[in-house]
């Protein structure tokens, strides 16, 4: 895809590769690794031995399809079978059986798992890499204190520190520290070995007092001293096996297990050659670390940058799934031990099949996917969202940081992120900088490091050979890396010029001959979201960040349209998202319809099902439309059907519409947007949304609940859409309050509520008369639409624990309206403030009314000038019928390259269409336009153009809310907060000042009493509105004031208030 004839070529990797490769690594290596750790299990008398033979494990293909798993709320998983043997030691007999040990959820080719019918994705985590790190801090006297921190594989820390007298201490807790000699002795070294293995023995001898000599005289003494300090135990503990085990479990296992990566890091940092399979901390490591620390004290060696990516590791899907498997097998081990013991006690003959249960493995994975912070519900608003979600990197999660504890330095961009983590794409708010996104070409290496590709240059006798290599953050430190790319100019020119380059975390300008490596692609430093922004180099980084987040919130429209100005990455994103249907074989189309495409090839006939009105978890509509005709011959890889928000296999999130940047009667004040009614009536920004409503039927103590159409006491019009079973019919139009599923719940009535004839039946015949309560599924407010699907899911067993579920899917057609949010691709967002008739909109010199009016003041202060370039180039493209795909940073080829391109295209458009107003030399890019109401031209020329504008998921229908009555908080007795809880309008301190400023005393009193937390007044208001009397004034204080008084009382402060009598102005003191 990239590169030219003389140079090496490179293709953009698959965007789902990171997830999929991680899962493949788990199935290929991690599974066997964990199964082979499963120990041999013996009974108490050592007569029976149970073991697993992992060489012959087997994963079975799932019996259900992915789509069925979603609709039936099942897990798309594979059963795992392993051979197990039971050996009787006395007779040497062995019984071998193939046993089922559990289900492992599978990942599809898009990197997504389906658990309980929900699409889930596991995101990658960044952790501090295990190893040793040297740092220096100033103490309260301003003297540098050097420390060496050893981080274990579990995240436990052991700190070594050196004091003013050059004594070295190991800090075992925040308050306790012990001498390095005691720690080494407790780990098994004697004094002679310690002095032989260090570079500065005289320093170690200098702080060896008689007391210290006694402590390290023997290993037992050292362990006792260490235990005393570590566990803060007083007195004289006695050495025993249990004390050793406790120390092993609490200290050495948590803080001294380095793992494979930790061992490699410590070996390279301390110049050791300890074998890789030695994954625990050794006395030799401690002594080498102490030597380095002494060197630091005397100015030798370099300190570590904790935020450099070489000191971080990526915990991928493979690592997380492997950890869970280890946990599940540990639980299985306990189960097998218990079962063997039970079988022998009851004198039963065990078999491998009877000893093993599949519950530990299956439940461990289900709870991991359901509860783990790094396992998230897949965001499927549009194809871009889906693909970006799997490429997230998080500093949060178990073993990581939290939003509260992370400092500014961790959140900041580090030079080592270059080409690995996108400097732009991160979340806004408390997690800014803690959740990042992978750069396009980045990949995860064998040791959990992030690798980025570069071209290596060999310049000999003017003939340059090029080789591509992937470098980890620790390797590219020592190279001069130029920011050149594959779309470079002629090399003869480039050899003579200076180029920007990066060397050892610094950015320099150097001659071309000194360059060792260069980047391979202009987008190499950015994530997918940022790479879709044209002219990103002209935007402020904060606005680019907002744009890459807002593109993920774009709603797929009913009629999508390709962008006129793009970056060339749109096709790759659409293909890798899996949304379009792609031909897997070449052949001929036999027939197409909305549900399937039938293809004939290689003598076989294939039926390719299409997605029809599928609901995403953000309620957007996923739908595929065929793009091939009957009789057409197609090749492998050709697009058969477009999906949601794709056109011709390219990502199409919004629309190219005619925009003017000008103020209009204050209706675009503060980022508001004025639009034409054409956008409503022409279905330009119309989208479909599918909502799911469900109801469960349980078996109660009074009997089972019934689904029925015969619901007493309800009006017939509410039941008009139900079929004979009591479930809403497909295709029916439903309004708010309509019954979707009729359900009756049996309940026992009180004696007094029976009718006289029912009492007679009970008394004479003993017949129990039951009554039922109506518990129907009703359509909530704002849910009106067309019923497109009804599913009756019956779980196996049919018990009260597995209730039957009825799901009703309703499609809504939403046009754009006042209050909806729209945005461009440069962080320029706004809310629709008014919809004008087309005749009142400003119009161009050729009579076309504009579709949207933006505020020009939103551009200079926010410094997102890229929108102006896109706007003008879009106009030229629409007039010339061209599409542009522009790589960023084109200024490296010549100055003002972007402006020259835009002006030259506008000039050509004005020539070809014979419209001189398109490019007027006095004010290029601007044009004189007319007021639609009067027909007069506006005073100033205005920028007009065709940018790409998206409609976002934040829609007014989901936000607007009113409260008539609802729930109150228990403590303050004030209305709850939020639409989902039927909450009230917040009236805070400043709102009270505003009402006071207008002198509206009665409204203010209503707000603070009847409508809020005055319990008695609230009840009286209801009564008087029904009867029709005057609303009484509230007498005493509202509940939140009484609460304040009680809180003060708990602090021994009594609060009284005085009532002045209106008649004689006498003060009556009353307790509150």
From Swiss-Prot:
The keyword Plastid applies. Pfam families: RNA_pol_Rpb2_2, RNA_pol_Rpb2_3, RNA_pol_Rpb2_6, RNA_pol_Rpb2_7. Its EC number is 2.7.7.6. It is found in: Plastid, Chloroplast. GO terms for molecular function: DNA binding; DNA-directed RNA polymerase activity; ribonucleoside binding. GO terms for cellular component: chloroplast; DNA-directed RNA polymerase complex; mitochondrion. SUPFAM superfamilies: beta and beta-prime subunits of DNA dependent RNA-polymerase. Keywords: Chloroplast, DNA-directed RNA polymerase, Nucleotidyltransferase, Plastid, Transcription, Transferase. GO terms for biological process: DNA-templated transcription. It catalyses: RNA(n) + a ribonucleoside 5'-triphosphate = RNA(n+1) + diphosphate. DNA-dependent RNA polymerase catalyzes the transcription of DNA into RNA using the four ribonucleoside triphosphates as substrates. In plastids the minimal PEP RNA polymerase catalytic core is composed of four subunits: alpha, beta, beta', and beta''. When a (nuclear-encoded) sigma factor is associated with the core the holoenzyme is formed, which can initiate transcription. Belongs to the RNA polymerase beta chain family. This is DNA-directed RNA polymerase subunit beta. It comes from Draba nemorosa (Woodland whitlowgrass).
